[in-house]
Amino acid sequence: MSSQSLYKVSGNIAANALVNNDKYKTMYQESIVNPEGFWREHGKRIDWIKPYTKIKKTSFDDHNLSINWFYDGTLNASANCLDRHLAEHSDRVAIIWEGDNASEQRKITYGELHADVCKFANALRSQGVRRGDIVTIYMPMVPEAAVAMLACARIGAVHSVVFGGFSPDSIASRVIDGKSKVIITSDEGMRGGRAIPLKRNIDDALKNPDVTTVEKVIVLKRTGGKVDWVEGRDVWWHSLMETASEYCQPEEMDAEAPLFLLYTSGSTGNPKGVLHTTGGYMVYASMTHEYVFDYKAGEVYWCTADVGWITGHSYMVYGPLANGATVLIHEGVPNHPSPARLGEMIDRHKVSILYTAPTLIRALMAEGKQHFDKFDGSSLRIMGSVGEPINPEAWRWYHEVIGHEHCPIVDTWWQTETGGILITPLPGATDTKPGSATRPFFGVQPALVDNMGNILEGENEGNLVLLDSWPGQMRTVYGDHERFVLTYFKTFRGMYFTGDGARRDEDGYYWITGRVDDVINVSGHRLGTAEVESALVSHELVAEAAVVGYPHDIKGQGIYAYVTLTRGTEETEELRQELRQWVRKEIGALATPDLIQWATGLPKTRSGKIMRRFLRKIAANEVTNLGDASTLADPAVIETLIESRLNRTE
């Protein structure tokens, strides 16, 4: 298949990279054969208050689960992101911020960021926040979001960031689960030219009678929009900062002390509070950021993720700032007010490294490459992809149109639960194949198993598991350790089950085939939905596709495809048949979609993730009880899809 084409590491990149192929092999081998020795050395990349002597105490036995790293050391995450850079790099720019409107821009040095974080840490203390308390952060993409996170870390409070697109109900469920005393928010946020009513959403969330722990709501004045005010509870950010001291001694925290909670959707629909601790997470976030992106001092690094997702935590805040990087933060969306915005920002800020998501790349593809006619892009050196498997066609478009065919692409696979990147190319070490996450990072031991838990060797396909721990791994589900054990360690004994399927090719490269629940069983044969979607999107008239299974009288499951066509393309029965034949040719007769529904839009969260549970229910004609659609960017998409569904029984 065309997706097997190999993009070789250029000699120039290999010669100047942190790691070439030989060094990768040596380091990886050491990390697996002697993990204690490997991490003993690489744990020193961050600053410790009390140096560790004990490295690793881990077991994936579901009756005796243990995940501990650097566990007799102490440190502070905020000090690692700020204080340790001040002696030599106080004047280096830490954050470049560009607002939704490009006319709004700020630059904040490490010295200034340190002062802001210390002041806000003292402000939090003045509002009763103490070590171990959980603080909910519901903020727009502004520097103050990072300030709030780092201030919590500085005083030993645990932050729980909630994505700014979530509904009041979603906020309430997270506040209730975490028993937050303090919420940090903003009057409004700006996104795509629209004001987002953040404070109003918090007010509505706090009307829930089960929210009983919140004492204070700290409000940043972002737009000056009108907000309701509750005297005694609500307090302005700027008022607190006016009187706060610029000195705040960082708390000495155990390596295994909680750093943050981040809620992710669970299969039951109840959010899971993923808990990450301090020492191992900081080592892993900073190391993966440096090695995966081949980061060099002074470069401008842009991660387009929202701070409300794990990518924003690990690769916009903690990893880059621990490494003394200059981070670009953008308040809006990179295709507003036009698809040219992404390229304009890369050129304007001389971005060296871009880390973005396939959903944005596909959206830009659909608009057409003419929007990049004026794009220079000469500053770009490395490009990354995150969030879902990137289909080969989008990979190539990204490589050609954004990367001008000279930037290596690191297609990274990881999860909220893993804390950092697990499977990825390294720019100077790994020949890449469009659509493949390639090889494991240091210390990561992936394996494929069948449904009975038997390890599959060589070229194969199965359930993706991890055989041993790594420092960035989550430690528990907050308040529900049993759920943690059940979700990740019961399915395959002695292994961490990722929930993803994957195949390993003849070169040992890993290809993520999608969530195991996104596998369709057609006449007894397993088909990854990502594979069928990739085939559809490789057709020049298809902008985006989502594929699910639906009940089929003969085959058990049939293949139902939702297809968004490129702008201006006519939806015809002839094209529908052409696409069916196209997939048949690309993958085989087994993968031919039974039903193709035209879709002007797909149900996505505001981070761009397609909510397939809605698509599965619509395809199965189960349209009366779809569940909560409040997290969708555009809930109206659901009604449109229901009205034009193809599998009606009435």
UniProtKB/Swiss-Prot annotation:
One cellular-component annotation, GO: cytosol
Its EC number(s): 6.2.1.1
Sites bearing N6-acetyllysine, chain numbering: 609
Protein's GO biological process: acetyl-CoA biosynthetic process from acetate
Pfam families per UniProt: ACAS_N, AMP-binding, AMP-binding_C
CDD domains (UniProt xref): ACS
Catalysed transformations (reactions): acetate + ATP + CoA = acetyl-CoA + AMP + diphosphate
Binding site for ATP: 387-389, 411-416, 500, 515, 526
Binding site for Mg(2+): 537, 539, 542
InterPro entries: Ac_CoA_lig (IPR011904), ACAS_N (IPR032387), AMP-bd_C (IPR025110), AMP-bd_C_sf (IPR045851), AMP-binding_CS (IPR020845), AMP-dep_synth/lig_dom (IPR000873), ANL_N_sf (IPR042099)
Keyword Magnesium: yes
UniProt entry keywords in alphabetical sequence: Acetylation, ATP-binding, Ligase, Magnesium, Metal-binding, Nucleotide-binding
One annotated GO molecular function: metal ion binding
Cofactor: Mg(2+)
Residue sites binding CoA per the record: 191-194, 311, 335, 523, 584
Purpose of the protein: Catalyzes the conversion of acetate into acetyl-CoA (AcCoA), an essential intermediate at the junction of anabolic and catabolic pathways. AcsA undergoes a two-step reaction. In the first half reaction, AcsA combines acetate with ATP to form acetyl-adenylate (AcAMP) intermediate. In the second half reaction, it can then transfer the acetyl group from AcAMP to the sulfhydryl group of CoA, forming the product AcCoA.
NCBIfam families: Ac_CoA_lig_AcsA (TIGR02188), PRK00174.1 (NF001208)
Protein family membership: Belongs to the ATP-dependent AMP-binding enzyme family.
PANTHER family in the cross-refs: ACETYL-COENZYME A SYNTHETASE
Protein name: Acetyl-coenzyme A synthetase
Gene: acsA
